Curated annotation (Swiss-Prot):
GO molecular function: DNA binding
PANTHER family registered for this protein in UniProt: ANTITOXIN YAFN-RELATED, ANTITOXIN YEFM
Upper taxonomic lineage: Bacteria, Pseudomonadati, Pseudomonadota, Gammaproteobacteria, Enterobacterales
The encoding gene: yefM
Function: Antitoxin component of a type II toxin-antitoxin (TA) system. Antitoxin that counteracts the effect of the YoeB mRNA interferase. YefM binds to the promoter region of the yefM-yeoB operon to repress transcription, YeoB acts as a corepressor.
Keyword Transcription regulation: yes
Native organism: Shigella flexneri
Keywords in alphabetical order: DNA-binding, Repressor, Toxin-antitoxin system, Transcription, Transcription regulation
Protein name in UniProt: Antitoxin YefM
Pfam families: PhdYeFM_antitox
Complex and partners: Forms a complex with YoeB which inhibits its toxin activity.
Amino acid sequence: MRTISYSEARQNLSATMMKAVEDHAPILITRQNGEACVLMSLEEYNSLEETAYLLRSPANARRLMDSIDSLKSGKGTEKDIIEWVMLPTY
């Protein structure tokens, strides 16, 4: 994770924000007399929040992990996005 000082972040706030957005990577901002903070794009933040929400339920987390294991062991089926969107909902 890229790390910059509070002073550098303040002097280059717009460029620092653009870097976080373009690189899809958080930036650690340190302070001499306080806790550090992390700057990240709204897209990255929303992604973390969604992941946390999906993993909050132990049953859902287990289903997701089982699906990942299934794909890693070659049991997955590749589909085009159109096929996936057109799947019936029950």
